[in-house]
Amino acid sequence: MAESLYAFIDSPGGIAPVQEGTSNRYTFFCPESFHIPPHGVVLLHLKVSVLVPTGYQGRFMALNDYHARDILTQSDVIFAGRRQELTVLLFNHTDRFLYVRKGHPVGTLLLERVIFPSVKIATLV
């Protein structure tokens, strides 16, 4: 049985994520254009939710200065079997307005395989 990451477009403007090659990394995009004021904060709803396959967990985070300088980001863990709406918290640490355009990459999801080994009792006596 194939394992798939399910992405749901929750409302108009939501943009489907793109897998980077055959890697465990998926890129998410800004659904609308906006400005972040100087020293401001924006909570951006991506209008997309995901369902992580069984046996995996996802680590979702905003893209850092690799794509947009002077923006600090946060991350979240997404567990398998639960549909999670995605949001990105963006901070502007500059003295100028930052413009983010629709379609700009703003988030990434890394899938990690999770195993649950059984416990064995060990003793040195």
From Swiss-Prot:
Keywords: Early protein, Host cytoplasm, Host-virus interaction, Hydrolase, Nucleotide metabolism, Oncogene. GO terms for cellular component: host cell cytoplasm. Changing residue 89 to Q: Complete loss of transformation. It holds the Pfam family dUTPase. The keyword Cell membrane does not apply. One of its GO terms (molecular function) is dUTP diphosphatase activity. It catalyses: dUTP + H2O = dUMP + diphosphate + H(+). GO terms for biological process: nucleotide metabolic process. InterPro entries: dUTPase-like, dUTPase-like_sf. Its EC number is 3.6.1.23. It is an enzyme of class 3 (hydrolase). A motif (PDZ-binding) lies at residues 122-125. It is found in: Host cytoplasm. It comes from the Viruses. Binds to human MPDZ. Belongs to the dUTPase family. Plays a key role in virus oncogenecity in animals. Binds and sequesters human MUPP1/MPDZ protein in the cytoplasm, preventing it from playing a role in cellular proliferation regulation. Induces cell transformation, probably by inactivating MPDZ protein. This is E4-ORF1. It comes from Human adenovirus D serotype 9 (HAdV-9). The lineage of its organism: Viruses, Varidnaviria, Bamfordvirae, Preplasmiviricota, Tectiliviricetes. The gene is E4.
